[in-house]
Amino acid sequence: PFKFVERIQQDRIVLEKFADYYDADRIKIERVTYRPIPDTTVRLANLQSGELDMVERIAATDVGTVNQTDGLSLQEVVGLGYMAIYANIGNGDRALTPMGEDARVRQAFSLAIDREALNQVVFDGTARAGNQPFPPTSQWYNQDLPVPARDVEAAKALLAEAGQERVAVEIQHANNPVVTQMMQVVQAMVAEAGFDVTLRATEFATLLSEQTAGNFQLSRSDWSGRPDPDGNLHQFVTCEGGINDPKYCNPEVDRLLNEARAVTDPAARKALYDEAGVILNQDLPVIYLGHQTYIFALDDKVQGFKALPDGMIRLQDVTLAE
């Protein structure tokens, strides 16, 4: 609904209304300026001063400040995607570890994590704890696979069953403050169960290329999510999946997810995803940690905006009061 006007590197992108857009009557704003501001404190300060009308995805730690500021409001929505740790199961020599070779070790690692505590410490309780590719708000969420409570003794028992007392493992993660804090909390939690974790921070683009190349043992990454459940699963966990970086392969999972692609009845599809989810919850090529909440902060003069779970900003029917 908008057309490009100008781009000033590291400063702004300016768009203006495209009059020939098919739905142009619903676009009430003539001009939009997007400003990249990496620092969350600076973003909030600009909103408070009136320099900005809206901030996309404020820090969870700033929610209280916004709530206490006259003239500002919040909109929050749980995203479609997930936060997770990918386990290298078959992608080269770095898969040849207890973590990569034995699902019991991965199960022990998962059981040693208190997902709700992780949410409270890192996200001030604004995220959702999770253990599936779908958030609890999704129709595809399997109610029969609730988030497991942390159980250090059960984790130790699984390690012993796998013939392990302590397991050394490296987790690579993006070098941003929130993810770093998250992994430090996980590192401390799983240590109590017998995991000696080394953290390796890297640029996100490098992290993705390392995943593809198999140069990882565990890798912490996010997925933004898709409205259709296929987009959160098939490409990640089928044998020939395009971004199946762990190189996990289970023919039964392939069968179920391929069949789900061909079924149109939602209830029948959900039954297939539920069945695949049970297997994935045992094999754990992906250790799901939770689901981010998209938090938008707005000046009260912005009216008609609605936060949506894909995190996209849509300006149909949005107005700016004088």
Feature names for model-found ranges:
Residues 289:
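Active-site-proximal polar cores
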Residues 124-144, 295-297:
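Mature extracytoplasmic/periplasmic domains
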Residues 2-5, 126-127, 302:
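Short glycine-aromatic motifs
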